């Protein structure tokens, strides 16, 4: 999914997690490992998380509260959003 306005900080608390980031024009993979690093994800980026180890835990910090209308859950809708 992606967000229209929300900024997120993804931190791997335990294990390993592959985060795929797609801006609609290209894709980049980031491996997050046990508190070693975090990933700042701006609005308008489609992300997918793949848990690489059993028991992996991802902590997500956001700059705003939950707002369902901020979510883009359909990839085709996301491509239209980034084309604007």
Task: List PLM regions with ranges.
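Flexible, glycine-rich phosphate/dinucleotide-binding loops
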Residues: 18, 26, 67
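A secondary-structure boundary/capping signal
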Residues: 13, 41-42, 62
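Double-stranded beta-helix
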Residues: 48-84
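Short beta-strand His + acidic residue motifs that chelate non-heme Fe in jelly-roll/DSBH
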Residues: 19-20, 39, 47-52
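Short, conserved beta-strand element in jelly-roll/cupin
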Residues: 4-19
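Short, surface-exposed beta-edge/turn micro-motifs
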Residues: 6-9, 36, 55-56
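Short acidic-glycine-tyrosine-enriched beta hairpin
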Residues: 23-43
